[in-house]
Swiss-Prot record:
Gene Ontology molecular-function annotations: glutamate N-acetyltransferase activity; L-glutamate N-acetyltransferase activity
Alphabetical list of SUPFAM superfamilies matching this protein: DmpA/ArgJ-like
EC main group: transferase
PANTHER family in alphabetical order: ARGININE BIOSYNTHESIS BIFUNCTIONAL PROTEIN ARGJ (PTHR23100), ARGININE BIOSYNTHESIS BIFUNCTIONAL PROTEIN ARGJ, MITOCHONDRIAL (PTHR23100:SF0)
Feature type site, description Involved in the stabilization of negative charge on the oxyanion by the formation of the oxyanion hole: T137, G138
Site (Cleavage) location in chain: A210, T211
Organism: Prochlorococcus marinus (strain MIT 9313)
Function of the protein: Catalyzes two activities which are involved in the cyclic version of arginine biosynthesis: the synthesis of N-acetylglutamate from glutamate and acetyl-CoA as the acetyl donor, and of ornithine by transacetylation between N(2)-acetylornithine and glutamate.
Gene designation: argJ
Quaternary assembly: Heterotetramer of two alpha and two beta chains.
The protein's name: Arginine biosynthesis bifunctional protein ArgJ
Subcellular location: Cytoplasm
Binding sites annotated in the UniProt record for substrate: T174, K200, T211, E291, N422, T427
Length: 427
């Protein structure tokens, strides 16, 4: 489903609110920008019979930027993406995504299978093989059933459409409960500009890329180096600022395509603002869809020396199992929050700490304040009962000094359902 709720909850220092407000949500996803096509089909890669093969095709002249897992154990498709982007100078045009098999820890066969898939698709699209990227998601150690995948390429290409974003978003899911897609539009330099996106992720989610796949598209031209730098800044404040369970994956990838008339230099900051809005919304959707989650957790940290340090504290709080279980139990246990913040490796004065849980202030000058525990617990329960990605967010605000740095991170609560899902994942 398209996520068109209020999304402009950006860090004040990430982008100005004036630039973010230029963008308005529209229906659609990754194929919403002009010239982009997408498709998603059921090829038979999953035993469940659910959609499992997706394709995104960018117009001629597109540039592509990529961010990938930081894990030393990387899937073959990640290595292939890196190699192909280098070989084509960032001029990739297509990405094929299979779900069901991660094709990680599969040795030389895994690499050859990814290469074979890219070669087969390149032939059908009449593209140089270096312009075709491959992404996989699913169970680690399981190779792709190549005969099944290759048999699915012809119907997949035939299904390409500028209205195929929703089908593509559905075909990349694994344990996700909902599709994650989003689109925006703005007037920049007297012309309409659109940004689209889709993502998947539910478990094995942690900062520095997580078991997530993210795809962004835009119908203006941007120089390759500027586009790559822009994507890195955006990912640092979105996909790298979320956590579900603290585990980093072998397959994490975020690819961004831009194609169209070159955008004037003076509008690049506004474009980045829109890209950040889209990426943050997708990141929040991933965190909210965390396995077994009942609510979204948003932590804002202020008062440290810089934004990077603020995000580090926020991520640490979001990732704390004790904080996450307290939120799930609707327990306003503020001690767990400040204890987690103190473990982030960022210096601050504990005597300067102030803390809020939603509208309830819990601490001031490093000491607890009297507060209505039942009301604070009720605040969290009301978020659980709220509507999806609208008023279902438990908000924590932590001020640790008078520095200029601020940052946000997103996570979710931790339930017994998460344990059941992952205990039974391969059985």
């Amino acid at each position: 489903m398209a996520l068109v709720e209020d999304v402009f909850s950006l860090s004040p220092k990430a982008v100005s609110s004036a630039l973010a407000s230029l963008w308005r949500p529209i229906q659609g996803g990754v194929s919403a920008p002009l010239g982009f096509q997408a498709a998603g089909i059921t090829a038979g890669l999953k035993d469940s019979g659910k959609p499992d093969l997706a394709l995104l095709l960018a117009p001629e002249g597109a540039v592509c930027a990529g961010m990938f897992t930081t894990s030393l154990v990387r899937a073959a498709c990640v290595d292939l993406c890196v190699d192909h982007l280098q070989a084509c100078g960032g001029k990739a045009r297509a990405v094929l995504i299979n779900s069901g098999q991660a094709n990680a820890c599969t040795g030389e066969r895994g690499w050859l299978d990814s290469l074979r898939a890219s070669q087969a698709l390149a032939g059908r699209l009449e593209l140089p093989v270096e312009q075709v990227l491959i992404c996989s998601t699913g169970v680690i150690g399981v190779p792709i059933p190549m005969d099944t995948l290759l048999a699915g390429l012809d119907p997949l290409v035939e299904a390409l459409s500028d209205e195929g974003g929703a089908e593509a978003a559905g075909a990349i899911l694994t344990t996700d409960l909902v599709e994650k897609q989003f689109a925006l539009e703005a007037e920049l330099g007297g012309r309409s500009v659109r940004i689209g996106g889709m993502a998947k992720g539910s478990g094995m989610i942690h900062p520095d890329m997580a078991t997530m796949l993210g795809y962004l598209s835009c119908d203006v031209g941007v120089e390759v180096d500027a586009w790559q730098a822009m994507l890195k800044r955006v990912v640092d404040c979105s996909f790298n600022a979320m956590t579900v369970d603290g585990d980093t994956s072998t397959n994490d990838s975020c690819l961004a395509f831009a194609a169209g008339e070159l955008l004037e230099q003076e509008h690049l900051q506004a474009l980045e603002a829109g890209l950040l809005v889209a990426a943050q919304q997708l990141a929040k959707a991933i965190a909210r869809d965390g396995e077994g989650a009942t609510c979204l957790l948003e932590v804002q940290v202020e008062g440290v020396v810089g934004d990077v340090e603020a995000r580090r504290i926020a991520r640490t709080v979001c990732g704390s199992s004790l904080v996450k279980t307290a939120v799930h139990g609707r327990d306003p246990n503020w001690g767990r929050i400040v204890a987690a913040a103190g473990c982030a490796g960022v210096p601050f004065d504990p005597a300067a700490v102030a803390l809020w849980l939603g509208p309830h202030q819990l601490m001031e000058f490093g000491e607890p304040l009297p507060f209505d525990r039942l009301a604070a617990s009720r605040y969290m329960q009301e978020r659980v009962d709220g509507s999806y990605l609208c008023d279902d967010t438990v908000q924590i605000r932590l001020v640790v000094g008078d520095g200029s740095g601020d940052g946000m991170a997103w996570g979710c609560d931790l339930s017994d359902q998460y344990v059941r899902i992952n205990a039974d994942y391969t059985t």
